[in-house]
Regions:
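Short, Lys/Arg-enriched N-terminal segment that forms or immediately precedes the first helix
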Residues: 1-16
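Long, charge-rich, low-complexity alpha-helical segments
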Residues: 23-74
Length: 74
């Protein structure tokens, strides 16, 4: 995952696309809003490549996979 970096001096250490100040969170929010990869690149971040967006998804998957999730019934 060399396309995603964490630097404590950029966005307070939030994961970003390498070589940019674009956070993984920003990309995930746009995907959640229903935008396609192509729309994100065309309308928001023309310097990104499709592989950068895929890397954001892979990063999120890796985080969730590493969590110890415990469901609690209310």
């Amino acid at each position: 995952m060399d396309r995603i970096v964490v630097n404590s001096h950029i966005h307070f250490g939030k994961p970003c696309v390498a070589g940019t100040r674009i956070t993984v969170q920003s990309i995930l929010e746009l995907l959640n809003d229903g935008l396609s990869f192509e729309e994100i690149i065309r309308d928001y971040y023309p310097d990104l490549q499709i592989e950068d967006i895929r890397a954001c998804l892979q990063y999120a998957i890796a985080l969730v996979a590493a969590e110890d999730i415990r469901l609690v019934s209310i």
